[in-house]
Amino acid sequence: MANNKSAKKRIKIAERNRLINKSYKSTVRTLTKKTLENCEKYKKDPNDENKDLVKTSLNKAFSLIDKAVKKNVLHKNNGANRKSKINNLVKTTLATQ
């Protein structure tokens, strides 16, 4: 256990940051899954409404990944890889229909 004031403060700050980072990572995963679900919906029923859903969910996922990279929750290469994988899937989904 920490003995001095600054060490106790660092423990408190580290815990706070861990929870914030956990929240960002969880939301990134959730938005990625929603984008994939919307791609599946579009494959089953290709119409303009589903296409808009795919595009808006892609934009939200990209935005949150960029914010996570900016706040050092994700490494920039990790963020780029995630965006690339999602984008390639969306491109193939939209191109096939």
From Swiss-Prot:
One of its GO terms (biological process) is translation. Pfam families: Ribosomal_S20p. InterPro entries: Ribosomal_bS20, Ribosomal_bS20_sf. One of its GO terms (molecular function) is small ribosomal subunit rRNA binding. The keyword Ribosomal protein applies. It comes from the Bacteria. Keywords: Ribonucleoprotein, Ribosomal protein, RNA-binding, rRNA-binding. GO terms for cellular component: small ribosomal subunit. Belongs to the bacterial ribosomal protein bS20 family. HAMAP family: Ribosomal_bS20. Binds directly to 16S ribosomal RNA. This is Small ribosomal subunit protein bS20. The gene is rpsT.
